[in-house]
UniProtKB/Swiss-Prot annotation:
Entry-linked Gene3D superfamilies: 3.30.1330.30, eRF1 domain 1, eRF1 domain 2
InterPro entries recorded: eFR1_2_sf (IPR042226), eRF1_1_Pelota (IPR005140), eRF1_1_sf (IPR024049), eRF1_2 (IPR005141), eRF1_3 (IPR005142), Peptide_chain-rel_eRF1/aRF1 (IPR004403), Ribosomal_eL30-like_sf (IPR029064)
Subcellular location: Cytoplasm
Entry's Gene Ontology molecular function annotations: translation release factor activity
Protein keywords: Cytoplasm, Protein biosynthesis
Complexes and interactors: Heterodimer of two subunits, one of which binds GTP.
Name of the protein this chain belongs to: Eukaryotic peptide chain release factor subunit 1
Family to which this protein belongs: Belongs to the eukaryotic release factor 1 family.
Organism lineage: Eukaryota, Metazoa, Chordata, Tunicata, Ascidiacea
A Pfam family that the UniProt record links to this protein: eRF1_1
Function: Directs the termination of nascent peptide synthesis (translation) in response to the termination codons UAA, UAG and UGA.
């Protein structure tokens, strides 16, 4: 369970960065006062601070007064942000500062600094009329890490593939006796010795796989591909010696004509289609499980904004499933006469109706305290409700059905909830007076 939770948390981080990239790419400024700064892990904050001080000196010579002041202001903002860090975080640091022009033509200051969800091995400093997000986009493209085990009669190779980066983790050679018809009375003994050596070889591969592909008691790869000539790979996948936690991660067995690095390259080519569909398959499985709950009428499911939020408040939602393009907005409104706060969830077509933003009794317009998309609010708060957040697309058949049929929001519950009974009870305020 813990392993799936980390995958889900990672997917939420990825969604947040995608959203950030979208808003940063759309932003434009006057002049060259928009600074993009990326510091890789193990770099020194002091080096970057010195570089910014030098840049400040250079920028003081810009002829245009307006541009000069805005560039100097942006550099000062970046320097202030850097003072918050004693050292560069383990995954590096990304800073965006500058003055952007909004759709209404007003100027707005933007200061963003964060540590990415995985190491960013890029060093960048640019002053431009836009923010540079290429390095962040690259960070998203190669997210899943896959393990490869290539076995043949001469030895085994262990490697990983992440995006376009392949890495050989370990390899060793073996000297296995070949089959032969000699030996007379000892032929059976020779065959037994041969089988024993094969058995030991498979055991060594299984033990090495645990050392390389399991950290902190959970697999560190999204999936495993077993490759090789002959039937070693099949023997390994069916063997009791192969760790159960890795067994469930096997995506494909592929036949390759070579061992070693050449076999590794061939295995990557042959399994490319399976690897590209992993996210897709996980999503299909998840929504399939959700549909199973509904078809079996277990009562351990919810859909629609209202029911899902009720179940969240009760701490009943185990897995919260939300479509990545859910357009519902969350508003917090305040009535100044009574000091009461009211929370609304509106679709784009409902937002145009201004009666939602006025008090029904007095007709007074309420002040908007907070507004953000419901999905963004979920992404920031789902852990408070003890849930796992899964953000899905509508590209699979199941995903499309989930969006069209269930409004793109739903959840799998820890226990059964009678929503109709709750609605009935809500109408009767005296019901709970005795408790």
């Amino acid at each position: 369970m813990a392993e799936t939770e980390t995958t889900a948390d990672r997917n939420v981080e990825i969604w947040k960065i995608k959203k950030l990239i979208k808003s940063l790419e759309a932003a434009r400024g006057n002049g060259t006062s928009m600074i993009s700064l990326i510091i890789p892990p193990k770099d020194q904050v002091s080096r970057v601070a010195k570089m910014l001080a030098d840049e400040f000196g250079t920028a003081s010579n810009i002829k245009s007064r307006v541009n000069r002041l805005s560039v100097l202001g942006a550099i000062t903002s970046v320097q202030q942000r850097l003072k918050l860090y004693n050292k560069v975080p383990p995954n590096g640091l990304v800073v965006y500062c500058g003055t952007i022009v909004t759709d209404e033509g007003k100027e707005k200051k933007v200061n963003i600094d964060f540590e990415p969800f995985k190491p960013i091995n890029t060093s960048l400093y640019l002053c431009d009329n836009k923010f540079h997000t290429e390095a962040l986009t690259a960070l998203l493209s190669d997210d899943n890490k896959f393990g490869f085990i290539v076995m043949d009669g001469n030895g085994a190779l262990f490697g990983t593939l992440q995006g376009n980066t392949r890495e050989v983790l370990h390899k060793f050679t073996v000297d296995l006796p070949k089959k032969h018809g000699r030996g007379g009375q000892s032929a059976l003994r020779f065959a037994r010795l041969r089988m024993e050596k094969r058995h030991n070889y498979v055991r060594k591969v299984a033990e090495t796989a645990v050392q390389l592909f399991i950290t902190n008691d959970r697999p560190n790869v999204t999936g495993l591909v077993l490759a090789g000539s002959a039937d070693f790979k099949t023997e390994l996948s069916q063997s009791d010696m192969f760790d159960q936690r890795l067994q469930v991660k096997i995506l494909k067995l592929v036949d390759v004509s070579y061992g070693g690095e050449n076999g590794f390259n061939q295995a990557i080519e042959l399994s490319a289609e399976v690897l590209s569909n992993v996210k897709f398959i996980q999503e299909k499985k998840l929504i399939g499980r959700y549909f199973d709950e509904i078809s079996q009428d277990t009562g351990k499911y919810c859909f629609g904004v209202d029911d899902t939020l009720k179940a969240l408040e009760m701490g009943a939602v185990e897995i919260l499933i939300v479509w990545e393009n859910l357009d519902t907005m969350r508003y917090v409104l305040k009535n100044h006469t009574t000091d009461e706060e009211k929370i609304l969830f509106l679709k784009p077509d409902q937002e145009k109706d201004k009666t939602h933003f006025t008090d029904k009794d007095t007709g007074v317009e309420m002040e908007m305290v907070e507004s953000c998309s419901l999905l963004e609010w979920f992404a920031n708060n789902y852990k408070k409700f003890g849930s796992t957040l899964e953000i899905v697309t509508d590209r699979s058949q199941e995903g499309s059905q989930f969006v069209k049929g269930f409004g793109g929001i739903g959840g799998m519950l820890r226990y059964r909830i009678d929503f109709q009974g709750m609605e009935f009870n809500d109408d009767d305020p005296d019901l709970y007076d005795d408790y």
